[in-house]
Amino acid sequence: MTLNEELIIILKEELNILRNLNDLTYGKTDIIIANEVEKLEEITKKEENLINEIALKEKEREELLYNWGLKKDISISEIIEKTPEGKEELNILKEELLNLLKDIQSRNLVNNELIQENLEWLDFNMNLIYNTQTPPTY
């Protein structure tokens, strides 16, 4: 198998993992809005597992590049420039990966904002409860 063929296999596997992660981040939004803490913990564990899978695929990709005499931090764009075959498929995969990563990143920002709003709401309510239970001092 050529470098590009092996790389395409790894990138497709990473893409599938990222799709699953993306689905979880969208599901996480609904769980945060519903304030379902136990489900949030479950989904966070699933996210961690997927992130670990991605890390393993990245190590596999780095080993592949090393075995082909390339630096492990070489970009897909550089590989596309240097190799004649599989350029089109690598370009498509690169774009899909970039778009998916952007989507995950933006959804995570939304989720973080929702969590922050929930924390502020809880803090406000705790202060309200505390202030109504504390007798006034004169």
Where are these regions (language model features)?
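Extended, charge-rich alpha-helical scaffolding segments
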Residues: 1-81
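Short terminal interaction segments
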Residues: 78-138
